[in-house]
Amino acid sequence: MINISFPDGSVKQFAQNITAFEIANAISMSLAKAAMVVEINGEFKDLSTVIEHDCKLRILTAKDYECLEIIRHDAAHLTAAAVKELFPETQVAIGPAIENGYYYDFARDKPFSRDDLATIEAKMQELVKKNEKITRELWDRDKAIEFFLSIGEHYKAKIIASIPAGEQITLYRQGNFIDLCRGPHAPSTGFVKYFKLMKVAGAYWRGNSRNEMLQRIYGTAWATKEQLDNYLFMLEEAEKRDHRKIGKELDLFHFQEEAQGMVFWHDKGWSIYNTIEQYIRKKNRKNGYIEVKTPVLVDKSLWEASGHWAKFRCDMFTLETDDKILALKPMNCPCHVQIFKQGIKSYRDLPLRMSEFGLCHRNEASGALHGLMRVRSLVQDDAHIFCAEEQITDETVRFCKLLTEVYKDFGFTDIKVKFSDRPEIRAGNDEVWDKAEHALKTAVEKVGFIYTLNPGDGAFYGPKLEFVLTDAIGRQWQCGTLQMDFVLPERLDANYIAASGEKKRPVMLHRAILGSLERFIGILIEEYAGKFPIWLAPVQVAIATITNDLNDYALEVQKTLIDNNIRTDINISPDKINYKIREFSNQKIPMIAVIGKKEQANKQVTIRKFGTTGQEILSIEQLIAMIKKENSNYL
């Protein structure tokens, strides 16, 4: 007999060589029917797995979040099986689960059409209804290569050929379809019920542009119909909110081929950019940061000394001049260390909080560029805190509080924290890492954040915190970071005089709240769907006249508002007032000030707020006071 330990703490005895499915069935028939996979001693396995020894066991159903990846992997196989039935001449390549879905790569001469996707999806539904059994098979490597070559699946044969000789190969069979896979998989195709094929795109074999182009079918799959419907609704909403679309509609920015990955900011977009920078600058100043400006172009010798040349050389833009190699900086940290090193620093100077809106350049692949979300030229709300070891916790607490304030001001209150601890390959000894990790954990707990652990995901030079925002339609964005660094101060020979009189290395905390300003503005455009709050809106008040004889008063109102640093637009054309209001509403301007004869006579305006039907009559002084009060909360 063997002892099986369950998650509830119970231990039960079963006959040796029992399968996981038989254990599920012994517990209850309904559990066995719902079971998808099993976790044995922390490793996910098929239900057909034979258990020979004592173990910890957990039976998983579609209700367990871990099964979502299984469902998506099963859906990928289901897609390939459907394609092979419909288009037998097509070769299959690879099909992994990815975030929110899966893809499968195919090789065929004729491109898949939209109609083909609908046909494939219908065939998948047929296979689900058949509830075909999914079985795991162990094959000899060479025989597996021979088999796939015999059925014309050259890509599968190539993948297997890259596996060391002598290794056993795992194949999964469902109906007439067989695929190379490590697994695990559900017992049958009937477990994949809620899916949709999304699109077709090109993809190079093995991700190498020198290889042949394959066709990649993307799909999504979920555990319930509600989850699928919610995801499709989110995608539909995301398409409406696409920052590239709204950016064009609101005349905020554009991109063009002559400067790939570089933003052409228009006046309204640049207004948003500068307002955010002004806001962050004020927050930093209140929290004891100094602001600096460092060169954009720096000799490669500094990047070699910092270690960035060895690690990021391929991602850096370089040029040669006067027998020197210069690089556009991809980050600000080595330059900040140079400022720290100017003059002798004492323990009394710490912590030194140094901020910069530093212009950085990164040579991102053209295929990875995506509007404001992924660019080659970017500015970060970057700062580095030089501190003593004993100051790490307090500085982290201070930063977390500042970050929370900033996110709240932009409307984000759902903040998730990820804590990444020591990787296997790392600098520093365990004692240093123990102190560093304890300091960060203590700080996060003091602020009241609940964090999830990313084991071993820290940088080799220190642990880190990542801060993830959830937007209005449920998407998550990792923006803020706090990264501890023991290595860079040593590499660049930064030190301070301790109270004892000896030289010590400062600890360096790399931190950002927004991350790239370009990306954060993209996130905000989609979060607000272009409807910016009044303090951030590029045009705060739009003035519209009912008749032309009111134009002089309207221009007088505009001048008064501009003199009070209020951003305005005006339409004094002969167009009808309803047309003017509609045009300004399409631009999502927070306030429209309508001027008629009555308003002129009383030195007033009638205010229509965006998204509301009501109106409010205000004096010019009242309007100015209202907007100034709103601005003063942030700027």
From Swiss-Prot:
It catalyses: tRNA(Thr) + L-threonine + ATP = L-threonyl-tRNA(Thr) + AMP + diphosphate + H(+). Its EC number is 6.1.1.3. The keyword Cytoplasm applies. This is Threonine--tRNA ligase. GO terms for molecular function: ATP binding; metal ion binding; threonine-tRNA ligase activity; tRNA binding. GO terms for biological process: threonyl-tRNA aminoacylation. Zn(2+) binds at residues 333, 384, 510.
